[in-house]
């Protein structure tokens, strides 16, 4: 009987891992109801996307999990919808106000030669400083606008159009819609918000092998792997340790069981898990040492054995089977993962062998 139950458990797990659902819909102009042909439909942070046909219809099959689906068309305001099951979506896009778009308001804080002054600084913090990240380049830097605020001593960067990045080390072209990047010089704290879409580069078999190896290197120890392992209940065997900041302490942490129901809940009806921590946690990855570039950047000793990141959750987060989690704005990180930026990130639909 036990063997039978185990067998069926494995069958159900396998079915869930392979399950798919389909998003269909039609994209039209909100005012005229005319179809919008070749509108872009894509899941943020993935390689999954399509376009509408001549009549505005689309269909997109997705692997089990949650996604933020973006629908966009030139000259129209984009829509973002969260999807996690089969659904038909009637989408009406609203035209941008061309009259307002033509009025360019020159901010007194804008830096005229911003790319020359801050381009390298921006790339180090937005793309990253690892050897992998250094191969990633922005093709359209003219889309960036740099604003410096003297009173608060902060730099803000915005983009007039999606950034076009090419990443030859990982084998992707990346379209990144940058909402904003802000760096606070007084505290050396920075954040950026936006969303990306990945397209795989074409290459010979030898190049595909290099990309496969590099992608696996980028995956090991990443936040994406952490989410996959947390969902699959395989944190410990994959080298992860979670410690919780002690009460009434600013520095001392104690190891916890991440699957204790104090912090972890399985939502059976939706195949989701919910996690929450009352205080800051440290996340240690014990299967890789920190990159030498990171140690130099942070002025840490060469013998530092593990990669450590620190997480504050504003509220609980929910993790879907594909590693997607929400709300992402409730996750604030420090430490190693902060050093790993766009140039070290993989699409969330990446699957290791």
Identify what each model region corresponds to:
Residues 1-26, 41:
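Bacterial Sec-dependent N-terminal signal peptides
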Residues 23, 30-45, 64:
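Short, ordered, surface-exposed loop/turn motifs in non-cytosolic proteins
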Residues 23-29, 56-58, 91, 103:
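A short, amphipathic beta-strand motif
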Residues 39-43, 69, 105:
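Hydrophobic beta-strand segments
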Residues 43, 70-81:
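A short, solvent-exposed loop/turn motif at the edges and junctions
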Residues 46-57:
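Short, acidic Ser/Thr/Gly-rich low-complexity loop/linker segments typical of extracellular
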Residues 50, 77-89:
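Structured interaction patches on ligand/partner-binding surfaces of diverse proteins
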Residues 89, 93-353:
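Surface-exposed, low-complexity/disordered segments
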